[in-house]
Curated annotation (Swiss-Prot):
GO molecular function, one term: phosphoribosylanthranilate isomerase activity
Gene3D superfamilies listed in its UniProt record: Aldolase class I
Pfam families documented for this protein: PRAI
Family: Belongs to the TrpF family.
Catalytic activity: N-(5-phospho-beta-D-ribosyl)anthranilate = 1-(2-carboxyphenylamino)-1-deoxy-D-ribulose 5-phosphate
Pathways per UniProt: Amino-acid biosynthesis; L-tryptophan biosynthesis; L-tryptophan from chorismate: step 3/5
Assigned keywords, A-Z: Amino-acid biosynthesis, Aromatic amino acid biosynthesis, Isomerase, Tryptophan biosynthesis
Source species: Pseudomonas aeruginosa (strain ATCC 15692 / DSM 22644 / CIP 104116 / JCM 14847 / LMG 12228 / 1C / PRS 101 / PAO1)
Top enzyme category: isomerase
Protein name: N-(5'-phosphoribosyl)anthranilate isomerase
HAMAP family: PRAI
Any GO BP: L-tryptophan biosynthetic process
PANTHER family membership: N-(5'-PHOSPHORIBOSYL)ANTHRANILATE ISOMERASE
Length: 211
């Protein structure tokens, strides 16, 4: 099984970004959604991204942002990848000179394959837990048996992942990547370095067990 990529999302401090990178995370996520308790402004985001070591991907998370807002952020913050968590159409996600992920929230009976197909330009599809009125960061897991065997795109698994359950998630779903926020926090927006290390170790040890 190829190495599962790991993203630590909801980073609000330079020290948490560096701790995630030191633990072995492949990417960190910055939330540009004012209603989130993990939101960062342009100045803080730029400071965090500039502090990252080489080969750690910076991801910007957006929820129904306007093109003007996106352009202002992208002009100031050197993000590598965009992640859209709202009701964006494919055309809203494209044309920003960055690859993008589209997040889809899982509901029983939903045609998730059909919904994913509506974003042919996406670099990957992120599956998250559905909670009405909450675009992400719910801290709740969904039924992993609902995940299709083939979305036609790299699959990023999110939603309620923790150091205790991510190994099982990787074994069952076999995602391209996993994405965690609340599951490695001391409080909202503040990461617990020990939990970050435990999360990364749980993912990596699952791969070692299968080789």
């Amino acid at each position: 099984m190829p190495a599962v990529r790991i993203k630590i999302c909801g980073i609000t401090r330079v020290e948490d970004a560096l701790a995630a990178a030191a633990a072995g995370a492949d990417a960190i996520g910055l939330v540009f959604y004012a209603k989130s308790p993990r939101a960062v402004d342009i100045h803080r985001a730029r400071e965090i991204v500039r502090a990252l070591p080489p080969f750690v991907t910076s991801v910007g998370l957006f929820v129904n942002a306007s093109r003007c807002e996106l352009g202002e952020i992208l002009d100031a913050v050197p993000l590598d990848l965009l992640q859209f968590h709202g009701d964006e159409r494919a055309e809203d996600c494209e044309g920003h000179r960055r690859p993008y992920l589209k997040a889809l929230r899982m509901k029983p009976g939903d045609d998730i394959v059909g919904r994913a197909a509506a974003y042919p330009g996406a670099a990957g599809i992120l599956l998250d837990t559905y909670v009405e009125g909450v675009p992400g960061g719910t801290g709740a897991a969904f039924d992993w048996s609902l995940v299709p065997t083939d979305l036609g795109k790299p699959l990023v698994l999110a939603g309620g992942l923790t150091p205790d359950n991510v190994g099982r998630a990787v074994e069952q779903v076999k995602p391209y990547a996993v994405d965690v926020s609340g599951g490695v926090e001391a409080s909202k927006g503040i990461k617990d370095a020990a939990r970050v290390r435990a999360f990364v170790d749980a993912v990596r040890s699952r791969r070692r067990d299968e080789t």
